Amino acid sequence: MAVARVDGALAPGEGSVVNWSGQGLQKLGANLPCEADVHTLILDKNQIIKLENLEKCKQLIQLSVANNRLVRMMGVAKLTQLRVLNLPHNSIGCVEGLKDLVHLEWLNLAGNNLKTMEQVNSCTALQHLDLSDNNIPQIGDVSKLISLKTLLLHGNIITSLRMAPAYLPRNLSILSLAENEIRDLNEISFLASLSELEQLSIMNNPCVMATPSIPGFDYRPFIVSWCLNLRVLDGYVISQKESLKAEWLYSQGKGRSYRPGQHIQLVQYLATVCPLTSALGLQTAEDAKLEKILSKQRFHQRQLMSQSQDEELSPLAAVETRVHRTPECSSPGQDFQESEPVLQINSWVGISSNDDQLYAVKNNFPAAAHAARYSRNDLHLEDIQTDEDKLNCSLLSSESTFMPVASGLSPVSPTVELRLQGINLGLEDDDGADEFTKGLENQDEDKDKEKSLWDMSESCVEMLKRKISTEVSEAAGLLPCPKSVIISAALKEDTHSLTSLPESAGHSASRTEANSEEAMSPATSEKFPCRILTQRPAALGQDKVTLQKLNAAATKLQACWRGFYTRNYNQQAKGVRYEIRLRRMQEHIVCLTDEVRRLRKERDEERVKTFVQEEAVRFLWNEVRSVQAWQQTVEQRLASWPPDVPPISSTLASPKPPLFPHHQDPSSDQSSDWLVAEDEAAQGRSAPDFPDSGFHSSLTEQVPCLQDSLDFEKSSVESSENSVLGNSADTVKCVKDRDSEATAEEHSDCSRESSASEQDNTLLQQYLTSVQQLDDAAEAADSDDVAGDGKRHLACSPERFDASSDSETHRVASTSQDEISQTPENCQLNEEAQGQPPECDPAFQGLHVGVTVQPV
């Protein structure tokens, strides 16, 4: 179909074949040069998107538009006489336009984008339906197609066969379900209703594929136990051993006791009763018994075959030597039309070189031609496919192959039928053909099957040589032909050879003059005696070509067999292959080990990094929590600070303004040194308990406040003494109002006035000296002794007063002690600000630090 041509070799009135394959056509114009008598139109391998302008081809019987870009198929709706429609490998998404095609018998829609299959129900005459390699998820209703014989659904996404009994026609004989998504082997039970099913394919489904978790099992006997009339499964003829196992599973075993959903239980059972055996030594005792029974049966069948062959030799020789004496040369086409076809033979003819597809052609032969060519000597089973090819390729990957032939040659259309790989030649009306085929199938299972095939092929070649030489010699001696007739016949032969069918259909035995000598038997060629002399050189050349083809086929067979035998039975080769596998395995293990080590190292590094980050985050979180708790505590204490206490400065490093800016004397310098020492001592005591965090809550910040309080305490005592001695009462004035703003103003005025008072400066120096002594005593002694010492120091601190003022001083001190005892809450607040224990510091028990009295 690769070259565009118009086949006009048919008889007038029978129509013609128009082939426009590979012409780069994108559309079918209105001026389509298609005559009314065209019965076959081939448009393969173009760029056609839409079928249009086909209405004038009303007599069209066969249409092929494969490998194009069709999206819809409504263009075929008006071709009511169509019998063969070939539309594979397009982009058709829906089946349409088939309502009026009541004569359609052969439909191929493989390799499209179909999702349903119910739209073909209107084609009730359909016999062959190919819907492979689509997107069909479930079996559709095609029960109205009562004439359907072949249904191809491989390469889809079918998951269940539950609707098969209701949706599939009963007369179906060929069913392909390979390469789908059937996961339960028990689904095969739904095919038991197809009583005429002979060929089935279930391969490359998940339910029959080997998995590491499931032991190996042979599913073929189980399928045969449900489909009792099955002859071919997954492209291989069912052997008698498998039939016996299937019968045992059906009658005595548990083959039919499992239901859909029990796939695992079924597989485990089949692994025990039908295990996979790769060598003869692994066969069980039951298999050995079956093999013994079958070997005896094959022996008797071979004896019967040899007897039947001897009986047929004599009538075959008589037919071959019979010569039809006709007064003039007649064409093969005329003789064929005169002879009525009496037999139809379905045979394998080969593999297409372009599409790699298997197909069979239905041929019509006269009775004499059938008796001569298709004798039992020529019937034998050959399998040139190696085991590796069977494992690596799908036996049903082939699709329906369209081959146009003349409509007048066969009363039944379509003329192309699909058969699964491995089917042998079958004679439909011969009772002994089935027995012979079974004998040959069993013969292939023998240990010496190769020798028998070689002997049979050699005998066929020798017989062919003898027949050709006998016919040529007899024709040369008995039927001379004029020279002019020989030349004209030779020219006519060459002319018809140029217009013959494609090479892929060369063995289809079509009745064109080009391949009539190749397809017809020597007995058929005896009808044309005047053509024998013209064909003698061509016959000799064909013999050489045939011998070369046979030698090439034999070489290929021998190479395949030697390779298979070496790989499986040669110990040295098996050892080398085993070493290679071990080496590859070791290298793979080393590579995986390195990868695991690298991943483990990365994991450890990541773990260490994660641990460090977690520790850092945990440490920071603890710090934040401690700071937040400390800040909350400080804020609570500041909130509970009494309103009569002046605000405290938060900066220790801020310079303290001098108390005596105008009058500097040695006593003021010494007072400044004592103040600095007291500040440093207070900072040293508070540093271990409260680190500097930036908040205004350090204990050392209270030193100015304490100093002011002590200053005011001393001033009040001095003022009382001055009032007793007659000094001026205007020096110190107690302020009773404790308002915070008035206190701050009065404190600043008092500071300015006290800086100008030399007497107040002397009193402050004496007070600081007493405070320093109290601090030293507190560090050296326990709390009780320190408290006693503090009282004695406070009692005897003013040494410059005379005896008359001592009594007054003791009275003032006792008054101050009473005031201190009346304000324990203020002492408690000061101690909480410093972070000390609940009891007050004994060094400050004699001081009134909670009450601030500012002089005016």
Curated annotation (Swiss-Prot):
Phosphothreonine found at: 534
Residue list for modification Phosphoserine: 308, 410, 497, 521, 755
Compartments where located: Cytoplasm, Cytoskeleton, Microtubule organizing center, Centrosome; Cytoplasm, Cytoskeleton, Microtubule organizing center, Centrosome, Centriole
Keywords: Cilium biogenesis/degradation, Cytoplasm, Cytoskeleton, Leucine-rich repeat, Phosphoprotein, Repeat
Acidic residues bias spans: 776-787
Region annotation Interaction with MPHOSPH9: where it falls in the sequence: 579-853
CCP110-binding: annotated span: 300-742
LRRCT domain span: 211-249
Compositionally biased spans, kind Polar residues: 498-513, 753-773, 812-833
Domain IQ: 550-579
Assembly: Interacts with CALM1, CEP76, KIF24 and TALPID3. Interacts with CCP110. ENKD1 competes with CEP97 for binding to CCP110, destabilizing the interaction between CP110 and CEP97 which promotes the removal of CCP110 and CEP97 from the mother centriole and allows the initiation of ciliogenesis. Via its interaction with CCP110, may indirectly interact with HERC2 and NEURL4. Interacts with MPHOSPH9.
Name under which the protein is recorded: Centrosomal protein of 97 kDa
